[in-house]
Amino acid sequence: MAAGSGEQELRAIIRDLGCGPYFLGTFDKRFPGFMAPHKVACAIVNTAGRETGGEHWLAFAWNPRSNTCYLFDPFGFSDQRLKQIYQFEYEGLLRRSALATKDRCVTWKSHQTCRVRVGRCGFSAACSTACAWPTPMDKNPTMNLLTGVPNGMLQSPQVEPTLRRNQEALYRFLNSHSAYFRSHRARIEKATAFDRMNQDM
């Protein structure tokens, strides 16, 4: 997908972060869901078809211990808002994942807006580590770096310093843990500059 962070770049960062054993791959909107109910898994999913070049990156994770599906969306959009903006909804993904479980029931968990991006389409490398961690929102080394803000305040100047600190914290984390990021830091930071984020929205 032609975006600020392409699939190859995302896979390289994810490999550096040690998420490989859990990572199913990068997918477009046709991601089939989590079909192996007994395995911890995560995936990076775009809201558009691969043939379009991509629009917005989301991260999903599956925790079999609690039949819990996690979503990390840097913008914190609701299912209704994602459908309105991108014609993408995750209810179908949940239904497909639930059909693979013994009792056909899953728990759904999301997160406040963090708006941290490594890529024009809203992907944050925090997505990959958040999803790969067995307890994605608890004691996670990247999620604990970030401060969420209410979704309704995403465009408010009041939260801009928080969002900027989130992005800088993520860059520092990736610089410490990803050889790929270190080798391509100047290009990645230019492509994902905070001001560019505002222009793209």
Curated annotation (Swiss-Prot):
Site, Cleavage: residue positions: 53-54
Q: What class of enzyme is it?
A: hydrolase
Q: Which reaction is this enzyme known to catalyze?
A: Cleaves proteins of the adenovirus and its host cell at two consensus sites: -Yaa-Xaa-Gly-Gly-|-Xaa- and -Yaa-Xaa-Gly-Xaa-|-Gly- (in which Yaa is Met, Ile or Leu, and Xaa is any amino acid)
Would you tell me the Gene Ontology cellular component terms? host cell nucleus; virion component
Q: What is its EC number?
A: 3.4.22.39
Judging by the UniProt lineage, the source's domain of life is Viruses
User: What processes does the entry annotate via GO biological process terms?
Assistant: proteolysis
Output the Gene Ontology terms for molecular function: cysteine-type endopeptidase activity; DNA binding
Q: Which Pfam families match?
A: Peptidase_C5
Q: Does the record bear Iron in its keywords?
A: no
Keywords assigned: Autocatalytic cleavage, Disulfide bond, DNA-binding, Host nucleus, Hydrolase, Late protein, Protease, Thiol protease, Virion
Q: Where is it located?
A: Virion; Host nucleus
Query: Where, by residue number, is the active site?
Result: 56, 73, 121
Q: What induces it?
A: Expressed in the late phase of the viral replicative cycle.
Could you say how this protein's activity is regulated? Requires DNA and protease cofactor for maximal activation. Inside nascent virions, becomes partially activated by binding to the viral DNA, allowing it to cleave the cofactor that binds to the protease and fully activates it. Actin, like the viral protease cofactor, seems to act as a cofactor in the cleavage of cytokeratin 18 and of actin itself.
Q: What family is reported?
A: Belongs to the peptidase C5 family.
Q: How does it assemble?
A: Interacts with protease cofactor pVI-C; this interaction is necessary for protease activation.
What's the miscellaneous note?
All late proteins expressed from the major late promoter are produced by alternative splicing and alternative polyadenylation of the same gene giving rise to non-overlapping ORFs. A leader sequence is present in the N-terminus of all these mRNAs and is recognized by the viral shutoff protein to provide expression although conventional translation via ribosome scanning from the cap has been shut off in the host cell.
Q: What does this protein do?
A: Cleaves viral precursor proteins (pTP, pIIIa, pVI, pVII, pVIII, and pX) inside newly assembled particles giving rise to mature virions. Protease complexed to its cofactor slides along the viral DNA to specifically locate and cleave the viral precursors. Mature virions have a weakened organization compared to the unmature virions, thereby facilitating subsequent uncoating. Without maturation, the particle lacks infectivity and is unable to uncoat. Late in adenovirus infection, in the cytoplasm, may participate in the cytoskeleton destruction. Cleaves host cell cytoskeletal keratins K7 and K18.
What is the name of the protein in this document?
A: Protease
Species annotation: Human adenovirus E serotype 4 (HAdV-4)
> Which gene name belongs to this protein?
L3
